[in-house]
Curated annotation (Swiss-Prot):
Alphabetical keyword list: Allosteric enzyme, ATP-binding, Cytoplasm, Glycolysis, Kinase, Magnesium, Metal-binding, Nucleotide-binding, Transferase
Inhibition and activation profile: Allosterically activated by ADP and other diphosphonucleosides, and allosterically inhibited by phosphoenolpyruvate.
Highest taxon listed in the record's lineage: Bacteria
Protein name: ATP-dependent 6-phosphofructokinase
Catalytic activity: beta-D-fructose 6-phosphate + ATP = beta-D-fructose 1,6-bisphosphate + ADP + H(+)
Function: Catalyzes the phosphorylation of D-fructose 6-phosphate to fructose 1,6-bisphosphate by ATP, the first committing step of glycolysis.
GO molecular function: 6-phosphofructokinase activity; AMP binding; ATP binding; fructose-6-phosphate binding; identical protein binding; metal ion binding; monosaccharide binding
Length: 326
C-alpha cells in the first residue's frame, strides 16, 4: 500500500477542482494515506512547492470556485531534464503517486511521469468539455449555468430595445458551451466550433428574422475562430441585417463562481475513484464519466480519442431555433 500521494491542478482553473481535491484527501485519509498538495501545478512540482493537506483544510473549499492549490502553465515540462527535477522532488518528499487535475496537456505530463516511475491518475478539469474520453468535464456544468444566466439577462435588455447581441463564449476549439447554451436559451443563431457559420450567413439569417418582425436576437459564437473581435463581428452583422447589434464577451466570468451540485458530485467521486486506483498500484490512467459511470482508461488511448460528431444535432437545432412565427 502506498503511504504518500500528491495532487496538483494544471492549466485553466475550473469550478469543482476544489471538490476533486477534497475527494482525494478524504478518501486517502480514510485509507491511512498522506496527501501533499503541489502549489501552482507542474511549476510547483519542479520547484518543490509542497504542502501537507488534511480533511480539515478541505472543509472550507467545497463551495469555492477556482483551485485552492493554484495553477500555472509550464511548457518546459516536456523537457526531460525538467521532469527529472520534478521526479527527484517527489522522491525526496516520499511521494509515490500523483493525481493530476486538468486538460489534455496536463495528461501528457502525467503520462511521462508514469513512465518515469511515478504512478499518475488524470482527472478532467476544464470548463470547455473538450476531452473526448469523458461525457462531461469538471467545471462544464457550472460554466454552462453561468453563461445561460448571462444570456438570459442579455435577452432581457435586447428585447427592450429591439436589438441583437453577439455573445462570445469560451471553448478552446470545442463548441459544447455554445451548443448547450443555444438549447437552454433558444438562441436564434449560434456558431459552435464544430460547425461554424460565416459572418455573411449569420447576417443574412438575422436579416430574415428582422423582416419577419422579430424584436430581438441572440447570436452565440465560439471564441477565437473568426480572427476579429466580437465587436467587429457585431458591426458586420448590423450592416447586413439592419439590426442594431451589440457585442458581449463573457470572458473569465465563465471560469469563476461556486460549483454546481453536479460539478461537485462528479469531481468528488472522481477524486475517490482516483485514490482507489492508486491504492491498487495502478497509474497512467485517466478517469472519465461515461453513461453516468466513472471509468478508467490508459492516458495514451484517451489522447487519441475523437469527440462525437455533433453536426447532425447542430443542424437540426438550427432549424428549430431558426423557426419564427407570430
Amino acid at each position: 500500500m502506498i503511504k504518500k500521494i500528491g495532487i496538483l491542478t494544471s492549466g485553466g482553473d475550473a469550478p469543482g477542482m476544489n471538490n476533486a481535491i477534497a475527494g482525494v484527501v478524504k478518501t486517502a485519509s480514510s485509507k491511512g494515506i498522506e496527501v501533499y498538495g503541489i502549489n501552482d501545478g507542474y511549476k510547483g512540482l519542479v520547484n518543490g512547492w509542497f504542502e501537507k493537506l488534511n480533511v480539515e483544510k478541505t472543509l472550507d473549499i467545497l463551495s469555492r470556485g477556482g483551485t485552492y492549490l493554484g495553477s500555472a502553465r509550464l511548457p518546459e515540462f516536456k523537457e526531460l531534464e525538467v521532469r527529472q527535477k520534478a521526479v527527484a522532488n517527489l522522491k525526496k518528499a516520499g511521494i509515490e503517486a500523483l493525481v493530476v487535475i486538468g486538460g489534455d496537456g496536463s495528461y501528457m505530463g502525467a503520462q511521462r511521469l508514469t513512465e518515469m516511475g511515478i504512478n499518475c491518475i488524470g482527472l478532467p478539469g476544464t470548463i470547455d468539455n473538450d476531452i473526448a474520453s469523458t461525457d462531461y468535464t469538471i467545471g462544464f456544468h457550472t460554466a454552462l449555468n453561468t453563461i445561460v444566466e448571462a444570456v438570459d439577462r442579455i435577452r432581457d435588455t435586447m428585447q427592450s430595445h429591439n436589438r441583437a447581441d453577439v455573445v462570445e463564449i469560451m471553448g478552446n476549439g470545442c463548441g459544447d458551451l455554445v451548443t448547450y447554451t443555444a438549447v437552454a436559451t433558444g438562441a436564434e443563431i449560434f456558431s459552435p466550433a464544430e460547425d461554424l457559420l460565416t459572418i455573411e450567413q449569420m447576417g443574412q439569417k438575422a436579416k430574415q428574422f428582422r423582416l419577419l418582425g422579430k424584436k430581438s436576437l441572440i447570436i452565440l459564437v465560439s471564441e477565437k475562430l473568426y480572427g476579429i473581435s466580437a465587436e467587429e463581428i457585431a458591426e458586420k452583422i448590423q450592416k447586413i441585417s439592419g439590426y442594431e447589434t451589440k457585442a458581449t464577451v463573457l470572458g473569465h466570468i465563465q471560469r469563476g463562481g461556486r460549483p454546481t451540485a453536479m460539478d461537485r458530485y462528479i469531481a468528488f467521486t472522481a477524486g475517490m475513484f482516483a485514490v482507489e486506483k492508486l491504492a491498487e498500484g495502478k497509474g497512467g490512467l485517466f478517469i472519465g464519466l461515461e453513461n453516468n459511470k466513472l471509468v478508467a482508461r490508459d492516458i495514451d488511448s484517451t489522447l487519441n480519442m475523437k469527440k462525437e460528431d455533433k453536426k447532425p444535432f447542430i443542424k437540426n437545432l438550427r432549424e428549430i431555433n431558426g423557426h419564427f412565427s407570430k
